Amino acid sequence: MVTMDKIQWLFPELEENYQYLHQHPELGFEEQITSAFIAQKLDEYGIPYRRVARTGIIADIAGKYPGRTVAIRADMHALPIQEQCDLSYASKCPGKMHACGHDAHVAMLLSAARYFAGLCGQFRGKIRLLFQPAEEGASMETLAAVAAEGGSAKGGAASMIACGALEGVNACFALH
């Protein structure tokens, strides 16, 4: 069973990741910095992944034994809102902020990824990590560009599903 004492070692990096992401908010389907940050962390943790849906990421952590596939999803984008606070890690991007907690969702999923990667496969099945862009949509201009690239103009979820995010998944949990 996972208890607080078994995961406390993850907290400093979780906070660091959260603050970095909070400072670098990006709107739907524009999450280039966020996506690169996630990819860098997954590389550090030795977790294979693939980039999909313009800025989305699908990563799988395989267990040593056959079993079900459980997906965990975190949304990545920020909102077009000016942050008005004096946090030391406030948004550095004028007119954009993580007002919905997506920065925390990504930080938490990265911590879960690190934890599961550290188990060295000592579990059944597979854990699929879904880092989804544009959960609350994107600008009409951006959606048109995504559609022209072969993605879905309906947003991040439809684009991720079209890229196979839920293929073989038996259960899915999401942060929001």
Language-model region placement:
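Histidine/acidic-residue-rich, glycine-tolerant segments that coordinate divalent metal ions
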Residues: 87-97, 104, 116, 121-176
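Acidic/His- and Gly-rich active-site-bordering loop/insert found
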Residues: 1-99, 103, 107-128, 133
